[in-house]
């Protein structure tokens, strides 16, 4: 299995093997097999670049608009969740591809060609794709039966996509690891493995530990000026799902999702279906919940993070749904969690 492409390089699983009174070696081996199988399957399901024999994946759905496809329950649930949340950003596939080109550029002049804020053609394209993405008559998902998905795409959008050479209408892009971490976590938990924590390099965490016997840590960083500063560590008990919205590059998966111009201007992956451009309300926002997975937590808070600025009132509303927030104002930590616990960094 080790040689097969999988999504595990983006994630770290830490597990307290042997704690349940069974052989540590045997438990580690069994857990490793389950986890690796899930990592291979997850990689395939959410892939937009190629097809695989054993699954119907996102690539297949993109290649067969207006056809009913039967998909794995994991992908069905992910698409249904995004659709139910009315998160139209899933339909910005062509603009995510363009953003990747921008972020992989070697210099500002090359990057600017893909930037709707700096290039007329790019601006025109962003506006066109956003207009299609906003309109359910142009693109939408239907779920006609159990694990069945149909991606409806209008003739007008198909013609435009063909003219522009697009290959993917649908792409989870920066949201993908939230759905993958939930799948990995739910898979091992379903097999009875609960004394573990999975984290992704781009800031998602699923802590499965329900014992309440162990304290876990999550680092708090804040971009102040052009310097990312450590502000200490949030302490928490499981189970928890943590989502980290950030307007700067934080981990290795971010290299092809963020770009910093020489003047300090950042481009981020948080594109909005309203105009096809990136929007961030603050340099960072951490949201977490003991009730929901990462995907639900992300979808509940995403629109708040895309606002002009963070609204304490809206974040309080989230807290009433048991989704808590941590953010910064004037370099001071703010939170909606009455039980928030953290250890400050020694300055």
What does each of the following model-derived ranges do?
Residues 1-347:
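Mature catalytic core of soluble alpha/beta enzymes
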